[in-house]
Regions:
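Non-catalytic cap/lid and distal C-terminal segments of serine-dependent acyl enzymes
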Residues: 26-54, 59-389
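Short beta-strand segments of immunoglobulin-like
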Residues: 21-25
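Short amphipathic beta-strand starts and helix->beta connectors
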Residues: 17-20, 51-52
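Bacterial N-terminal signal peptides
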Residues: 1-10
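Boundary at the C-terminal end of the N-terminal hydrophobic targeting segment
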Residues: 13-15
Length: 389
């Protein structure tokens, strides 16, 4: 009798259990369907890098909201749900990108192409990604740096180094977990389009790394700048370093702690001709701050959708006014932005015009896209073959 009761209760519970939600779902024609169970919600919207637009979702009789988007181009997309004003991850999707501060984590989905894309793993020799803890004397707490070593690293020596900086919404893992920098370089090296190189990916925020201990941080200068003057003030602050054109606290960490550690512990060259620095968005502003202060250290510079403005000459006038010397310092000054980037795009265009005004030799690229990883993966794929020539 007891067994019969248990069986009846079990059957009843199964009958009452809601059907599992499938999300995300990518169809063969590259349409993306997202679903989110929220029977009591009044409004649910899908947001993110999908196609630049928020997508209101429709509620079904089962309390599951859904929307179908596309067809989308083959790529890696981030998204989240806005549920009555609150951001939420896709609970059915374990593929998540870490975020920082108000940007928060987001869900990730890849829409496949007809074959492997330039950022996908292919049957080629692969390098390694190492997570290296270190004590930052410049900042006063523990941090980690992610380091890519190319295939065959153990048998080589004096590799060139690319210092690759992330944006405000990411941490040091960003260029690997969502940017696929390691796979992009594996593929380029296998195709003999890029030289084998070490890539150093530091934490761009002046905080203790999430995985090294309790939260510690310097005062958030960007938040203070935004409170005073909005986005323009933030861009100027990132580009100007200490506010006067000197090195920022992050830059001091990179140059005084990370760079010496890398050159002591890894098989890398110490020649400026074998160093490059590149960054996206916030990292682009940091790249300018470092490159203009220490042009003797890096012969290759690349800025992707950089947090910069045309007001750079207010703080770097001495450097910019001597174009002949500046042009001798850099073998490459590369500058790129997405055509539809409304966040840093206006400042980027002003900055490019300022470089031209002062006669600074540079390569300017405008690519399809907005302020998003779709653009930055393409940028890295284009930049890497230009380095260390």
């Amino acid at each position: 009798m007891c067994l019969g009761v248990i069986m009846v209760l079990s059957t009843t519970a199964e009958a009452q259990a809601p059907a599992p939600v499938v999300s995300p779902e990518v169809s063969t024609d590259r349409r993306l369907t997202l679903r989110f169970r929220a029977p009591d919600a009044k409004q649910v919207t899908a947001t993110g890098e999908l196609d630049g637009q928020p997508h209101p979702m429709t509620k079904g009789t089962d309390g599951v909201w859904s929307v179908t988007i596309g067809p989308l181009a083959p790529d890696i997309y981030t998204y989240a749900f806005n549920v009555d004003g609150t951001s939420a991850l896709d609970p059915q999707n374990t593929n998540t990108k870490l975020g920082y501060g108000s940007f928060g984590p987001v869900s990730v989905v890849e829409v496949p192409g007809d074959g492997p894309q330039f950022y996908d793993a292919k049957p080629v020799p692969h390098g390694e990604v190492r997570i290296r803890p270190y004590e930052s004397k410049a900042l006063g707490f523990s941090r980690t740096v992610w380091i890519y070593t190319p295939p065959g690293y153990e048998t080589g020596k004096d590799y060139p180094v690319l210092y690759l900086l992330h944006g405000a919404g990411d941490v040091e893992s960003g260029w690997v977990l969502i940017g696929r920098a390691n796979l992009i370089l594996d593929n380029l090296i296998a195709e003999k389009k890029a030289k084998p190189m070490v890539i150093v990916m530091p934490l761009g925020h002046t905080i203790q790394s999430f995985w090294t201990g309790p939260a510690k941080a310097l005062p958030n200068e960007m938040a203070a700048a935004y409170a005073k003057g909005g986005l323009d003030a933030v861009l100027f602050a990132l580009m100007s370093g200490d506010g006067k054109g000197g090195l920022s606290p992050f830059a001091k960490d990179l140059l005084d702690d990370v760079l010496p550690m890398v050159e002591k512990s890894y098989k890398v060259s110490k020649r400026p001709e074998d160093r490059a620095i590149a960054g996206l968005s916030m990292g682009g502003g940091q790249t300018v701050n470092i490159a203009f202060n220490r042009p003797d250290l890096f012969k290759y510079v690349a800025v992707m959708s950089g947090a910069v403005t045309g007001k750079a000459d207010q703080i770097y006038s001495k450097f910019l006014s001597n174009a002949e010397q500046a042009n001798k310092q850099f073998k490459l000054f590369w500058f790129g932005v997405g055509k539809d980037d409304t966040l840093t795009g206006p400042g980027d265009r002003e900055f490019a015009q300022m470089l031209a005004k002062y006669g600074i030799t540079h390569t300017a690229r405008v690519t399809e896209g907005r302020h998003e990883w779709t653009v930055w993966r393409q940028h890295l794929n284009e930049i890497a073959p230009l380095l260390f020539k």
